[in-house]
UniProtKB/Swiss-Prot annotation:
Protein name, entry field: Protein translocase subunit SecA
Subunit details: Monomer and homodimer. Part of the essential Sec protein translocation apparatus which comprises SecA, SecYEG and auxiliary proteins SecDF-YajC and YidC.
First-tier enzyme category under EC: translocase
Reaction(s) this enzyme catalyzes, per UniProt: ATP + H2O + cellular proteinSide 1 = ADP + phosphate + cellular proteinSide 2
Record organism: Erythrobacter litoralis (strain HTCC2594)
Residues binding ATP: Q87, G105, E106, G107, K108, T109, D499
Length: 917
């Protein structure tokens, strides 16, 4: 009450902040006549003028008023659109690195041009991030007209474009693309062995469209580039067959957390089934020998019970495709980890792709926090304002609408069960459609959208269904959802980014209806006809009450509900919104208070009868807040754990960059060799120990294993006052001499490439293994809570130790390969290297898709760079040490890398003749 009174007297802090920006808007408006008087050439010349001013010491804030006035006038001349004052406010907010919350239809795309142009003048690059490829292409083409007119370059990043085009797009002043494309390019760049092949340049300024969707909804799922491991198809299928025989009483499922566990009776029963299937190594299910089977059993149970087809995923083209729970869109290229995706594939009987090992990973939180300045736009951010600040240090500023919102948001209607609810929904839709009022229906899953479609078919109501199955036509369906009597069913908020205009969208109608008509008088006449029809239809829709938004159930997040409501009432248009709920809705069933069901049952509701109640609405809001808090905790935990990895990732990526930028890395290699020798001696002869305590035999073995040397330790031990430091110095001299002889017998230019190539390769290899270890640690560290320990603190401590071990192993590995291997110059490679290195073709991501053709160790690329490598710890050298890719008699044959080598050595193929493949 007191806060409400204070706001009414003094206004909210948001109101005061927006009002303060009004002074800048006044400066921009004061320049309008002056800028309007400029010729086209003079207006275009403003960009160079601003660049000169920046070079003379002015700041972006200094030139902001005139730059914004320039963009507004250029927009009028090029696009036929003038920025409103509230849009200028939004532009200032974006430039300051904040989030502009603007209602649907307020022109966020146009707002972005202000901050984008201003920051692009510096020439350091501006990234405009969208939620899908369609919007990236559309906005780059649409707003690109304005930027290029003003002398700026524009690029767009979409899947499957060549590397050179991708690099050119990043070098443009302004680059459009999706969050996935930007993130995966960052990871791929940091796996390359040559700086020239990288596509991104240093981060500068990013503007994230639909910022809540990208930075909040998708923040629970990290971006992962991975390579396939060994094929376990038979095991997945066998375990799935066992799980399909499981009795529901054998397990306990928690729908809130999507966790599932076996009961005591279930453990015993499933153990019998596994024995019958011949899947157990020992009699006891939980013996260590059965760890892998138990893991796949748990994943198969989760896949069969907790993951629902057409809700969590769909099957398309014989593949399991994940459905984004917030947008209803397909997440092409994304796969569940730890064997879960393979378990779902086995459940559905589709081709089982190999399980993958993480090679590079980053969360969206840590990716976007690398931008020195980041801003965002959305229609709904206020409910997550605290999270935006806690994670990204970004304020949310609510921008006033240009025209007051006329939409009426009605009370929710409650029904006893789903059938009653859907019958009422179908009836309401039929009534509204009959009077010409367009209806947009929001559902939470494909299954529900298709169930409602069946109800509407029975009512004889013509309608369009928009879900992950039909996403290709998404923009066109949404664009026409405001036509007279149109009924559109959309799963969650599919279609964000496309305005629903009452009466229909002129541009889309022209595109759909006149695509085959050539330019000329006939086409011009047809365009005028369509414009007139849309205008007349708009008037009829306005008379019918505008767009009616109908929600079939409440989402877990209030923000998603607000997004659905926000599709109606754009730019002062009339509109109506209403939600239909029942006790069988997931939100109420899983998270609703226990008393809700009793009160509903005692309300004497007849079948098909609805009830409206403030108490029920309050219960819904409480349940949503509970889920939002839980989801925030999950996202916060994700970033806490990734922060640990992120610190290590920065070190590794910075080290890679230094190596790539260095002409030679001989100093690094020498330091690694000396550090390795120090570690060998220190391990065998600990400081403060006596000679009789030294492990001389162990030191002999390790020096020969790592360095290929056989120093006379027995003679040295007979010397008086022998010290570990003397061992270290003498071993170092022997190792340095061996390396000097090797280098002297090798082409200097080749040796530089060898050192750099091996250093990068082994760094990548051990980083990949380190990521796998951290993943495994993450899976089990939560168990430390039972010992009254903080899992995150335990994770930090162990991760640090593992990272130190990574660096130690890297030093030893590089030293061993260089000192023990023999090299020869390979014949020159005539063909041009591919844009993407060979080892990237096995990655699971939107650019490259799935490919199980190699194990991702980069050997093919190394062979091209510096010839074959023999005698390393990873390869069995043939006599004379000249083993290599050209000496493999089995090259080209389809041999699994984990199969025994055909030569009969007893080693796996990948450790023998297949080592350089």
């Amino acid at each position: 009450m007191f806060q409400t009174l204070m706001k009414s007297v003094f206004g909210s802090s948001n109101d005061r902040y927006v009002k303060s920006i009004g002074k800048i808007v006044d400066q921009i408006n004061a320049l309008e006549d002056q800028i309007k008087a400029l010729s086209d050439e003079a207006l275009k010349a403003q960009t160079q003028k601003f660049r000169d001013q920046l070079a003379d010491g002015k700041t972006l804030d200094d030139i902001l008023p005139e730059a914004f006035a320039t963009v507004r006038e250029a927009s009028i001349r090029v696009l036929g659109m003038r920025h409103f004052d509230v849009q200028l406010v939004g532009g200032v907010v974006l430039h300051r690195g904040e989030i502009a919350e603007m209602k649907t239809g307020e022109g966020k795309t146009l707002v972005a041009t202000l901050a984008t142009y201003l920051n692009a003048i510096e020439g350091k690059g501006v990234h405009v991030v969208t939620v899908n490829d369609y919007l990236a292409r559309r906005d780059a083409e649409w707003m690109g007209q304005l930027y290029t007119w003003l002398g700026l370059s524009v690029g767009v990043i979409v899947p499957n474009i060549p590397e050179h085009a991708r690099r050119d797009a990043y070098n443009a002043d302004i680059t459009y693309g999706t969050n996935n494309e930007f993130g995966f390019d960052y990871l791929r760049d940091n796996m390359k062995h040559d700086r020239a092949s990288m596509v991104q340049r240093p981060f500068n300024f990013g503007i994230v469209d639909e910022v809540d969707s990208i930075l909040i909804d998708e923040a629970r799922t990290p971006l992962i580039i991975s390579g396939p491991t060994e094929d376990k198809t038979d095991l997945y299928i066998a375990v799935d067959e066992v799980v399909k025989r499981v009795d529901p009483e054998w397990y306990e499922a928690d729908e809130k957390t999507k966790n599932i566990s076996w009961t005591e009776d279930g453990n015993e029963a499933v153990e019998v089934l596994l024995k019958e299937a011949g899947l157990l190594e020992t009699d006891n299910l939980y013996d260590v020998e059965n760890t892998q089977v138990v893991h796949h059993l748990d994943q198969a149970l989760k896949a069969n019970i907790m993951f629902k087809k057409d809700t969590d995923y769909i099957v398309k083209d014989d593949k399991v495709v994940i459905i984004d729970e917030f947008t209803g869109r397909m997440m092409d290229g994304r796969r569940w980890s730890n064997g879960l995706h393979q378990a779902v594939e086995a459940k559905e009987g589709v081709k089982i792709e190999p399980e993958n090992q993480t090679m590079a990973s980053i969360t969206f939180q840590n990716y976007f926090r690398m931008y020195p300045k980041l801003s965002g736009m959305t229609g709904t951010a206020a409910t997550e304002a605290s999270e935006f600040w806690d994670i990204y240090k970004m304020n949310v500023v609510e921008i006033p609408t240009n025209v007051p919102v006329q939409r009426i948001d009605e009370e929710d209607e409650f029904y006893k069960n789903t059938l009653d609810k859907f019958a009422a929904i179908a009836k309401a839709i039929a009534e509204k459609s009959a009077i010409g009022q367009p209806v947009l229906v929001g559902t939470v899953s494909i299954e529900k959208s298709e169930l409602l479609s069946q109800f509407l078919d029975k009512e004889g109501v013509k309608h369009a269904v928009l879900n992950a199955r039909f996403h290709e036509s998404e923009a066109h369906i949404v664009a026409q959802a405001g036509r007279l009597g149109a009924v559109t069913i959309a799963t969650n908020m599919a279609g964000r980014g496309t305005d629903i205009q009452l009466g229909g969208n002129v541009e889309f109608r022209i595109e759909d209806e006149l695509k085959d008509m050539e330019d000329g008088p006939e086409r011009e006449a047809a365009i005028e006809r369509i414009k007139a029809e849309v205008k007349a239809e708009r008037e009829k829709v306005l008379e019918a009450g505008g767009l009616f938004v109908l929600g079939t159930e409440r989402h877990e997040s209030r923000r998603i509900d607000n997004q659905l409501r926000g599709r109606s009432g754009r730019q002062g248009d009339p509109g109506l919104s209403r939600f239909y709920l029942c006790l069988e809705d997931d939100l109420l069933r899983i998270f609703g208070p226990d008393t809700l069901f009793a009160k509903m049952m005692n309300s004497n509701l007849e079948d098909g009868e609805a009830i409206g109640s403030k108490w029920l609405s309050k219960a819904i809001e409480t349940a949503q807040k509970k889920v939002e808090a839980r989801n925030y905790d999950i996202r916060k935990q994700v970033v806490e754990y990734d922060d640990v990895m992120n610190d290590q990732r920065k070190v590794i990526y910075e080290q890679r960059a230094e190596i790539m930028d260095s002409e030679a890395v001989d100093d690094v290699v020498v330091d690694m060799r000396h550090d390795t020798i120090n570690a060998l001696v220190t391990t065998a002869c600990p400081p403060g120990s006596y000679p009789e305590q030294w492990d001389i035999e162990g030191l002999k073995e390790r020096v020969e294993e790592v360095l290929g040397l056989a120093p006379p330790f027995d003679q040295w031990m007979e010397e008086e006052q022998i010290e570990p430091e003397i061992f270290e110095e003498r071993i170092r001299e022997l190792a340095d001499k061996a390396m000097e002889e090797k280098i002297a017998a090798t082409d200097p230019a080749m040796w530089k490439r060898v050192e750099k190539g091996i250093l990068l390769d082994r760094l990548d290899h051990h980083w990949k293994e380190h990521l796998a270890t951290l993943d495994a640690l993450r899976q089990v560290v939560f168990l430390r809570a039972y010992a009254q320990k903080q899992p995150i603190n335990e994770y930090k401590q162990e991760a640090f130790g593992l990272f130190e071990r990574l660096l130690e192993t890297l030093r030893e590995d590089v030293t061993s390969i260089l000192i023990k291997s023999e090299f020869r110059i390979a014949p020159p490679v005539e063909q041009e290297l591919p844009d993407l290195p060979d080892f990237l073709t096995g990655h699971i991501d939107p650019l490259t898709g799935l490919d199980d053709s190699n194990d991702g160790d980069g050997s093919a690329q190394r062979a091209e760079l510096f010839g074959s490598l023999a005698g390393s710890p990873r390869a069995a050298a043939s006599p004379g040490g000249a083993s290599g890719v050209t000496d493999n008699p089995y090259a080209g044959q389809d041999i699994s890398r984990n199969a025994p080598c055909p030569c009969g050595s007893g080693s796996k193929y990948k450790h023998c003749h297949g080592a350089a493949i």
